[in-house]
Amino acid sequence: AKSGRASCKKCGDNIAKESLGLAIMVQSPMFDGKVPHWHHYSCFWKRARVLSQGDIYGYTELRWEDQEMIKKAIETGGAAAGAGGDSKGGKGEMTLNDFAAEYAKSNRSACKGCEQKIEKGQIRISKKSVDVERPQLGMIDRWYHPDCFVSSREELDFLPSYSASQLKGFTILSAEDKDSLKKKLPAVKNEGKRKADEVDGHSAATKKKIKKEKEKESKLEKLLKEQTELIWHIKDELKKVCSTNDLKELLIANKQQVPSGETNIVDRVSDGMAFGALLPCEECSGQFVFKGDAYYCTGDLSAWTKCVAKTQTPNRKDWVTPKEFHEIPYLKKFKFKRHDRAFPPCAAPTPISPPAAPEPKPTVEETFPEGKPLTNTKVLLIGKLSKNKDEVKTLIEGLGGKVAGSAHKANLCISTNKEVKKMSKKMEEVKAANVRVVSDDFLKEVESGKSVQELLSQFGISSWGAEIKQEAVQPTEKQPSSGPVAGKSSGKVKEEKGSNKSEKKMKLTVKGGAAIDPDSELEDSCHVLETGGKIFSATLGLVDITRGTNSYYKLQLIEHDRDSRYWVFRSWGRVGTVIGSKKLEEMSSKEDAIEHFLNLYQDKTGNAWHSPNFTKYPKKFYPLEIDYGQEEDVVKKLSVGAGTKSKLAKPVQELIKLIFDVESMKKAMVEFEIDLQKMPLGKLSKRQIQSAYSILSQVQQAVSESLSEARLLDLSNQFYTLIPHDFGMKKPPLLNNLEYIQAKVQMLDNLLDIEVAYSLLRGGADDGEKDPIDVKYEKIKTDIKVVAKDSEESRIICDYVKNTHADTHNAYDLEVLEIFKIDREGEYQRYKPFKQLHNRQLLWHGSRTTNFAGILSQGLRIAPPEAPVTGYMFGKGIYFADMVSKSANYCHAMPGSPIGLILLGEVALGNMHELKAASQITKLPKGKHSVKGLGRTAPDPSATVQLDGVDVPLGKGTSANISDTSLLYNEYIVYDIAQVNLKYLLKLKFNYKGGMMW
């Protein structure tokens, strides 16, 4: 302990200066970071669980005797013997403080293994661990049935040397229950003796090898002991004879950075005197610092990302002691002798991030193997399956998936028809969570290599089930289908949000040009100060994937509506959680308030408030361009009394309501992991979205060229800072594969369309004479008429829907609710030159309902130049299909929201460049007007009819006699927006059969 001021979090007494204290690092509720909870050495083991010395940050920098003491405690499972421990479980045994046995006090607890109730009075065994979503609670009991605990013994870290009699509370059990537990949880015989027996049975060569290994271990331990004693001898002498300023001068003389804190300064000087002065990092010229398992660079690769260089053999030069220090006898006598630093086996280098500070149980972020059929799929198992659950779990993990513990964490359930009919409580939870259920035959077929998406439909046994999305897209359907920029799916499994996620809905009160943060509690009587056209409000972001931080900082200067009173309000925390705090300061004058605001902004960003060009600095925040132009109440007008005065046909009114549905927009943004608290709907500027596109292009290039992970870190930090994401307590994922990049491109596509819809919703005030629906209808500048159900064109279009539903898309049937004839203002004039082109077809194009305000008002668009080309099978263009269900999949309907919209457009295809595999088209070959991706199945060409002089390929799907193509169905792509004339919009109902296929 550096001082005697810290108090133990277990017993409350002070921890004496220079005594050994151990801390558990927990998430601070006040800011986006962790804080140490210090404990006396003896108290620590009653609360924490340590598996190896490497789990304790700073272990190798302790005195040798302290290292040995900790090592022994870890070997005994952190057990406490005698004083400070629980009762002894048996002769010479120590009680394990993080494992306990008792009789259940009620029937409310559930087993963490099988998830069934533990009945009152039954024996239950607990393993103490930290709840990753509520780490501030410390170690909490996770209860198991005895048999479930036994089956999970290894993964629960109940070591072979442990026995049931060491469980806390074992002594109060009945004799019968003690005997039962002893049989179920026996200790493995003495490892040392067993190893000796094994050695005796080995050949002479093996014995010699084992002997050499032991000698090597012994030699390393001796070296580590000598090294530690040398370092501590230097430290002790320096503390006696040198002032802090002397030590700083020594560091400067050896061209080493001077850290803050006396202890850190002593550590740096002693390291240099023992091993040599460290040379700068070759990557960034930063300072290397010893941190337990290696030397880590503390410099920055860029303004966005810290350097990730680490090594156990850094370059050094001899340590020099300037002559002016020869007045100090110890330094005068000191003769530098170069040593190479030795590292213990438990301190092997770990990837990228520095070693974690001591935590009771390290939490590993869930990862999925790439390129496997069940990658990103979390599977819940219910009921008695054809194989035992351990075998099924192994099979699922082999296919790239993970077994989930509960319905709300799963996106697929494997069970039986019997369980579905029985509708147990667990199955009710599955239904409530809208998780699709399949039989275990599904796994056998997946293992054989068949298409996952088709099998999901084939083996579905529930009448419910939400869309299952995977990052890895199936090869035959990898290409974008029919979206304005090649389909607009999030392409990302929806992660479960932590319990720390903020659920409150913020009501933003806009006065003048900005919304007052409601956390200030001044919104009713105040406004944000605006002077010289500059609004004194800033929202800042900072993401550091290496550290796992995802922080925000909000700053406002607030002025009273009537009085001359001023406040500076600031709030900070972790995006998407309730972690954070705030501060409201009343200032004595306007001038003082402005000065304080400017100083805070400069401190957090490194930039002057009035600076025209912002420069990002390392470890500093970056401003988000957020436009609080209108109150949300203006947007809500559409739903209040809408339609009462409308002159539009009822079906058209319902269509306008559907495409301007604010709740659907919010749901889409949540699905994309967008943080609605820090980035309210429609508030992020178009320029910032375009900047994010540009970053994704750079990410794509970096991935394609296999550039360093440090470069990907840098770009990922930039992207997540520009577009605030809600990852809860999870670490922001690295943008390191093309599928995830494409998912983020599609997210930005949708954000742009939502931004268009929202700007139409809130743009311009009406006089109150017109119905809100009519006002929005006029803004999309599209003539929309209802097509009569008994008309010829309705019959043709309905046949087109019925006949071109693909066999593999059999999870749902499509029901045509309405057909609208549409005429976008100015589109026909733009299309007119292509009207004379041959080969004009009426083709399908599907998209989310939230995108249709943008599509109708601005037309189908091609991906912007800033967007990366990844994910577009045939380059950036507008994609169409001749099979309705291929495009319908891109409507992103689901059982809980079964209504979708799909377009029929007249497309001037002309001479088609026919392809069977992906090709990044940037310029069509001479004489070609479009691209056709050849599919294995296509509408029967003999059944094609004409509608207003345009071919309608409404024949039933039949084999195209093309076997060497990577596409299941045809794709049509044009690269000039003028080649498209939108003709019809269909409102469809997706009638799901037994689940959903994507």
Swiss-Prot record:
Domain of life from the UniProt record: Eukaryota
Grouped into one coarse class, the protein's main location is: nucleus
Q: What residue stretches are annotated with the PADR1 zinc-binding domain?
A: 211-345
Instruction: Describe activation and inhibition of this protein.
Output: ADP-ribosyltransferase activity is regulated via an allosteric activation mechanism. In absence of activation signal, parp1 is autoinhibited by the PARP alpha-helical domain (also named HD region), which prevents effective NAD(+)-binding. Activity is highly stimulated by signals, such as DNA strand breaks. Binding to damaged DNA unfolds the PARP alpha-helical domain, relieving autoinhibition.
Motif Nuclear localization signal: where?
193-195, 207-212
- The WGR domain, residue ranges: 525-621
Could you name the Gene Ontology cellular component terms for this entry?
chromatin; cytosol; nuclear replication fork; nucleolus; site of double-strand break
Q: Subunit comment for this entry?
A: Homodimer; PARP-type zinc-fingers from separate parp1 molecules form a dimer module that specifically recognizes DNA strand breaks.
* Catalytic site: E971
Protein name, entry field: Poly [ADP-ribose] polymerase 1
Where do the record's region annotations for Zinc ribbon lie? 276-318
Q: Where does Zn(2+) 3 bind?
A: C281, C284, C297, C307
Q: Note the zinc finger regions (PARP-type) by start and end residue.
A: 1-78, 99-189
Report residue spans for region: Disordered.
Answer: 185-211, 348-370, 471-510
- What InterPro entries does the database record attribute to this sequence? ARTD/PARP, BRCT_dom, BRCT_dom_sf, PADR1_C_dom_sf, PARP, PARP1-like_PADR1_N, PARP1-like_PADR1_Zn_ribbon, Poly(ADP-ribose)pol_cat_dom
Stored Pfam families: BRCT, PADR1_N, PARP, PARP_reg, WGR, zf-PARP, Zn_ribbon_PADR1
Which GO biological process entries does UniProt record here? ATP generation from poly-ADP-D-ribose; DNA ADP-ribosylation; double-strand break repair; innate immune response; negative regulation of innate immune response; negative regulation of transcription by RNA polymerase II; positive regulation of double-strand break repair via homologous recombination; positive regulation of single strand break repair
Extract the SUPFAM superfamilies matched here. ADP-ribosylation (SSF56399), BRCT domain (SSF52113), Domain of poly(ADP-ribose) polymerase (SSF47587), Glucocorticoid receptor-like (DNA-binding domain) (SSF57716), WGR domain-like (SSF142921)
Q: Domain note for this entry?
A: The two PARP-type zinc-fingers (also named Zn1 and Zn2) specifically recognize DNA strand breaks: PARP-type zinc-finger 1 binds PARP-type zinc-finger 2 from a separate parp1 molecule to form a dimeric module that specifically recognizes DNA strand breaks. The PADR1-type (also named Zn3) zinc-finger mediates an interdomain contact and is required for the ability of parp1 to regulate chromatin structure.
A molecular function GO annotation? NAD+-protein-aspartate ADP-ribosyltransferase activity
Protein localization: Chromosome; Nucleus; Nucleus, Nucleolus; Cytoplasm, Cytosol
Source organism of the structure: Xenopus laevis
- Positions of Zn(2+) 2 binding: C111, C114, H145, C148
